[in-house]
């Protein structure tokens, strides 16, 4: 993970142009890497092997068959994207997914992430819900031998990112309106984003 953090903390002289030929090729190669069945579509099992970066960073400090993204997040993505026939993702949907993941913690689509995070459909996020996503992220960080605080401490800190009317309770409106919605999401569903954030003072 240290190499991933080093890459993320490098100055970005050339912001990603998502419409360039080079990026299109990298996106297609990433898609083919995950399409183990050669079906031209991806299912949840395929996407649970997702590795970040364009071009894809395979050596991210995690086992080859472990994605930095929470499997619960991926399952919820498929559950909430009702436009996907037969719970399969085509290349167009894949590109949308990649852009959403690779631009975190920036977030131009808070509604997209809210639908995924609101497991109970109640319009509020509680520590129990956040911990459901973060549990796996925390385990991956520990497995990588990293020294990090307890889950309870981090969940508390994550809730502090978003101004709320009630402590430890984020409503849909508070999430959508917050400039920290992307960071809130990234820290609980992506172990690489979490570790990069923890090392942000090195920038």
Over which residues does each language-model region extend?
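Detector for Asparagine
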Residues: 14-17, 38, 43-46, 81, ...
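Primarily EF-hand calcium-binding motifs
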Residues: 23-39, 48-51, 61-65, 69-99, ...
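Solenoidal tandem-repeat scaffolds enriched in leucines and small polar residues
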Residues: 1-20, 24-28
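Amphipathic regulatory helices of Ca2+-sensor modules
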Residues: 1-8, 41-69, 88-102, 124-143, ...
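Long, highly charged low-complexity segments
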Residues: 16-26, 68-73, 101, 109, ...
């Amino acid at each position: 993970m240290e190499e991933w953090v080093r890459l993320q903390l490098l100055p970005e002289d050339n912001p990603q142009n998502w419409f360039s030929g080079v990026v299109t090729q990298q996106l297609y190669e990433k898609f083919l890497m995950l399409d183990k069945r050669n079906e031209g579509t991806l299912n949840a099992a395929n996407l649970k092997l997702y590795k970040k970066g364009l071009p894809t960073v395979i050596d991210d400090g995690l086992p080859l068959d472990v994605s930095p993204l929470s499997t619960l997040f991926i399952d919820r993505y498929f559950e909430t994207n009702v436009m996907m026939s037969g719970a399969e993702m085509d290349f167009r949907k894949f590109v949308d997914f990649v852009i959403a993941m690779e631009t975190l913690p920036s977030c131009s689509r808070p509604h997209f992430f809210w639908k995924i995070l609101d497991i109970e459909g109640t319009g509020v996020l509680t520590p129990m819900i956040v911990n459901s996503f973060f549990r796996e992220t925390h385990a991956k960080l520990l497995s990588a031998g990293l020294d990090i605080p307890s889950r309870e401490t981090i969940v508390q800190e994550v809730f502090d990112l978003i101004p709320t009317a009630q402590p430890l309770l984020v409503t849909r409106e508070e999430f959508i309106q917050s400039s920290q919605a992307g960071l809130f999401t990234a820290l609980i569903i992506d172990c690489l984003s979490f570790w990069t954030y923890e090392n942000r003072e090195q920038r």
